Amino acid sequence: MEAEKWRYYLQPYINTSRHEGFYERDYTDQLDRFLSQKYTRAEKWIRTREFNRAQSNLEEIKSLDPNYKEVQSLLEFSQVEPIYVQALDLLEGNKFREVHDLLQPMLKKYPNQEVLRKLEEQAIERGKYRLGIISDPNIEGSEATMSAALQSAVISLIQKNNDPFLELLDRTNFEMLQQEQEAIINGTTNEAAVTKELLAADAYLKIVMTHVNENEGTLNKQTRRGWERYYVTTKSNEGEQVKKAQYKKVTYKEYTKQNEASYDMQLAMVERSTSRILWSISFHHEDKDEIHYVEFSGTGDLFSGNWRYQNKEHPSDHRKNDSRSMNRLVKANKRIQSTSSMRKDAISALAQKAAAHVNQQKLTKE
C-alpha cells in the first residue's frame, strides 16, 4: 500500500543522531500532506458514492494515524451506508428476512448504529409471522393426551430457536384459538372469535397424533431342564491330584418379554383467513425393547439340554455344548424399557422433527 511504502521510506531518517529534529519535522510535514491528500480523496469518493475506494484510503489513514480528523467516523459511514441502501431496497421489496440477515454482520461490528438498528426493528415488525398452535378437538384418548404433550414440546423447541420473525401466540390467547379450532377443522373461519386483529394468527399449526399403538408385553416364564458342570478332585495313576468335570441334572427358569410401540403424527399449517391448508406432513416413530435371561441357583457352568429322570440315567438324556451362551443369559439384563418411557422418547423425537420442519420454513409475512 502507498501509505506503508511512505512509512518505510521515511523511517530510517526519523531516529538519526545528527539533525534529529530536522528529520522529525520533515517526516511530520510529509506525513501531514500525505494524510491530507488521502483524506480529501476519501471525502470525494464518499460524495460520489465510491465507497470501496473511500474505505481503502481511510483504512490507510487509520493505520498511520488512528486519530486523524474524522477518519473513524468516515470509515464507519463508508461501510454502513452501502449496506443501509441495499437494506432499504430489500425492505421496499418486502424481503424482510433478507434485510435482517444483511444487517447482522454490520450491527455486530457497530452495535451502536441506531440507523441500522431501527431498520432491523422495522423489518422484524413488518415481517413478523404470528403462529397459533392448535389440536383437533375431535380426537380423544391416548391420541389426545399425547397431542397435548407434543404441542407443549414443539412450542418449547420453536421458542428456543429464537427466530425474531416467528411469534407464537401467548398462552393467554389460547382461549381465542380454541374458539376457532372447530371452525378451522371444519374448513371455515370464525371471525367473531377474533376480538383484536393484533392477536390474530397469520396461520395455525395443527399438531395431531393420528395413531398410538403401545404393546406392553407379558413376562413369559418357562422352567427348563439342563446340566450344571462341577469339578471333583481325584488322583491319577501317578498319584497327582487331577480335577475332573462332572455334570448333574438341574432345572432353571428362562424369561422373555418384549415391549413395542409405534406412533404417527400429522403436522399441518392452515391459513387463518381462508382455512386453506398451506402444507401437511406426517412423521412416524417406533420403538422396541426385549429381555431374555435365565435364573439359575447353581454356582457352576450351566448347559441346556434335556433329561427324562433327574436321579437316574436314560438313553434320551442329552446335553448341549453351550455353556458360554447360557452363562451370558444368566448375567443378562433383566430390566426392560416400559411403554410409558417409549412414549416420552417418542414425544421428544417427534417434537424435534416437527420444530425442525417449522423452523426450516423461515416463516415471514410478505
Language model: regions and residue ranges:
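A structural "domain/chain start" motif
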Residues: Y8, T16-R25, Y39-E50, S56-E60, ...
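N-terminal leader/linker segments that initiate helical-solenoid repeat arrays
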Residues: M1-E4
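Short secondary-structure boundary motifs at beta->alpha junctions and helix caps
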Residues: E228, N237-D264, R272-L350
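N-terminal segment of the mature soluble domain
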Residues: I133-S135, G141-N220, G239, S262-D264, ...
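Internal, charge-rich low-complexity segments
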Residues: Q181-G187, T210-T234, K288-R308
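Extracellular loop and loop/strand-boundary signature of outer-membrane beta-barrel proteins
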Residues: Y27, E191-A193, T251-E254
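Short coil/turn motifs at beta-sheet boundaries
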Residues: I124-R126, L198-A200, E254-E260
